[in-house]
UniProtKB/Swiss-Prot annotation:
Record-annotated disulphide pairs: C204-C319, C296-C311
PROSITE patterns for the chain: C_TYPE_LECTIN_1, C_TYPE_LECTIN_2
Classification via SUPFAM superfamilies: C-type lectin-like (SSF56436)
PANTHER family named in the record: C-TYPE LECTIN DOMAIN FAMILY 11 MEMBER A (PTHR22799:SF1), TETRANECTIN-RELATED (PTHR22799)
Protein name: C-type lectin domain family 11 member A
Length: 323
């Protein structure tokens, strides 16, 4: 019995060292060769069996899986999985508690970011403002050019109007001398339009003349013959350029000169031997008789006598043009 234990003490360490070497060789074999894995496991199991029989050891003692069998490997993997599960359980999961308050650095960073955004927006506004300023300058220059062009156009229109006025006056003067009465350095032309005295003067002026202003009795007699021939057999009063609007009884021509002679109408004188009438003839009173109500002078077309009338009365008129 002592010999058996002695043999076991000598053989078992060698077998165990062989088993560990076999397992190391197995690992090398699995890593490098992998061809005789099953054969090595069978040899190892057989040697352990013989050793147990020689020593009289029970089948359950010793290394339960000395050769690293598949069952031992599975147990080792299970233990590894359990260890990983324990590590996962031991790993603390992040809590869902309230987030920590921002630090001063975070606040400063946020403020700087907002300021950067505001600065970028302000830069865009400056760019747009510059574009608007450029547009305003362009529009101002265009408006100035338009004003200059409008001024030039206005000057051109005024020049055309002046030229048209001169042409109309020249046309009226030529028409007056061609169609009317030429007398010395004057031409008289009768107009059969009914106008007030001021309107008649304006129309004569627009045609380059004025209302008739007979300078002496010779011109007065020539004008009388012209009006009688133009309006016969009727008797029409015709406006002359004579009035006393400035002062009652002070008769002036339209050019401001004082009238040097008069041809006022006088009522018929009674025949010799007849009783003189105390009152003037009601249809032909002596002129002027209107006072301040009648300040303009018209000439009768039949005899050339002068009558004072209300200046607003609408009558024929005769224009005078220089020749």
């Amino acid at each position: 019995m002592q010999a058996a234990w002695l043999l076991g003490a000598l053989v078992v360490p060698q077998l165990l060292g062989f088993g560990h070497g076999a397992r190391g060789a197995e690992r090398e074999w699995e890593g490098g060769w992998g061809g005789a894995q099953e054969e090595e496991r069978e040899r190892e199991a057989l040697m352990l069996k013989h050793l147990q029989e020689a020593l009289g050891l029970p089948a359950g003692r010793g290394d339960e899986n000395p050769a690293g069998t598949v069952e031992g490997k599975e147990d080792w993997e299970m233990e590894e999985d359990q260890g990983e599960e324990e590590e996962e359980e031991a790993t603390p999961t992040p809590s869902s508690g309230p987030s920590p308050s921002p630090t001063p650095e975070d606040i400063v960073t946020y403020i700087l970011g907002r300021l950067a955004g505001l600065d970028a927006g302000l830069h865009q506004l400056h760019v747009r403002l510059h574009a608007l300023d450029t547009r305003v300058v362009e529009l101002t220059q265009g408006l100035r050019q338009l004003r200059n062009a409008a001024g030039d156009t206005r000057d051109a229109v005024q020049a055309l109007q002046e030229a048209q006025g001169r042409a109309e006056r020249e046309h009226g003067r030529l028409e007056g001398c061609l169609k009317g009465l030429r007398l010395g350095h004057k031409c008289f032309l009768l107009s059969r339009d009914f106008e007030a005295q001021a309107a008649a003067q304006a129309r004569c002026t627009a045609r380059g003349g004025s209302l008739a202003q007979p300078a002496d009795r010779q011109q007065m007699e020539a004008l009388t013959r012209y009006l009688r021939a133009a309006l016969a057999p009727y008797n029409w009063p015709v406006w002359l350029g004579v009035h006393d609007r400035r002062a009652e009884g002070l008769y002036l021509f339209e050019n401001g000169q004082r009238v040097s002679f008069f041809a006022w109408h006088r009522s018929p004188r009674p025949e010799l031997g007849a009783q003189p009438s105390a009152s003037p003839h009601p249809l032909s009173p002596d002129q002027p008789n209107g006072g301040t109500l009648e300040n303009c002078v018209a000439q009768a077309s039949d005899d050339g006598s002068w009558w004072d009338h209300d200046c607003q009365r609408r009558l024929y008129y005769v224009c005078e043009f220089p020749f």
